[in-house]
């Protein structure tokens, strides 16, 4: 009987020791899992900047760049501090900060700015879009005669609403006339006269930055006036004559419209009427 009691005591002791070891092992494993999850936790960085490829139109010749904007409305007069760096094989855009005005009276819109990349040769460039040199986003910038494209591996702190921008062809003009019904005859006369300087034409489907062209339909991106009138007509044409020859026609039409309408025309070289 004494021998049986000893056996039971040894069994109970062994069972307790095994249970203790098993419990310690579970705690260690559980602790490791928690530590591991903490190590791979992803920090959610607020997306304050919107950035997309852009063609900067100029009379001296267009060049590629980026259009950068805040994702939220900012005080009027806010600016974006941008530091671009371009080499033979690399492009770096460092978004430093929003520079606020001394006083904030209105927050009517997002703040926008462009940064130039110069005359890039066709090919692929290693791209970095960074926030204060702390948050680093890597990708590729591809340049061709007709398009500028961006592919990113990460987009921490930024959004890229448009990844491909097509170049605006030489001789292209586009715009909008908004007017009230009593100006119908004037608008018809302007449209007929415009046809003696330019003709309608089509483009490859895509986003051209300043406008979109899809299935023979032109849609202006929001760069024109937002003034509201009862009627609207859009123009998308290729010049048959020098751009300067349009000046008198456009200015005279604007004068006759007065406060009863608004005419806005932009050209391939950045000139806006």
What spans do the regions from the language model cover?
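Sec-dependent bacterial lipoprotein signal peptides
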Residues: 1-34
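Bacterial Sec-dependent N-terminal signal peptides
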Residues: 24-50
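First exposed extracellular module after export/assembly in secreted or surface-exposed proteins
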Residues: 43-273
């Amino acid at each position: 009987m004494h021998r049986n009691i000893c056996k039971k005591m040894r069994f109970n002791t062994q069972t307790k020791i095994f249970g203790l070891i098993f419990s310690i092992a579970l705690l260690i494993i559980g602790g490791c899992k928690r530590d591991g999850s903490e190590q791979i936790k992803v920090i959610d960085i607020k997306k304050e900047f919107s950035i997309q490829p852009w063609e900067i139109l100029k009379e001296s010749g267009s060049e590629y760049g980026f259009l950068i904007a805040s994702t939220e409305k900012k005080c009027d007069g806010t600016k974006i501090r941008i530091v671009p760096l371009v080499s033979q094989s690399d492009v770096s855009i460092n978004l430093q900060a929003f520079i606020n005005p001394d006083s904030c009276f209105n927050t009517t819109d997002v703040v926008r700015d462009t940064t130039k990349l110069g005359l890039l040769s066709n090919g692929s460039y290693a791209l970095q879009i960074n926030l204060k040199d702390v948050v680093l986003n890597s990708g590729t910038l591809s340049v061709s005669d007709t398009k500028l494209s961006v592919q990113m591996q990460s987009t921490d702190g930024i959004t890229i609403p448009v990844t491909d921008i097509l170049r605006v062809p030489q001789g292209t003009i586009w715009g909008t006339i908004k007017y009230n019904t009593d100006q119908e005859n004037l608008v018809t006369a302007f449209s007929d006269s415009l046809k003696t300087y330019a003709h309608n034409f089509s483009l490859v489907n895509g986003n051209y930055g300043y406008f979109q062209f899809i299935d023979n339909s032109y849609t202006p991106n929001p760069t024109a006036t937002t003034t509201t009138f009862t009627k609207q007509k859009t123009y998308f044409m290729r010049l048959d004559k020098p751009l300067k020859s349009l000046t008198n026609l456009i200015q005279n039409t604007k004068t006759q419209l007065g406060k009863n309408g608004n005419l806005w025309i932009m050209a391939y070289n950045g000139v806006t009427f």
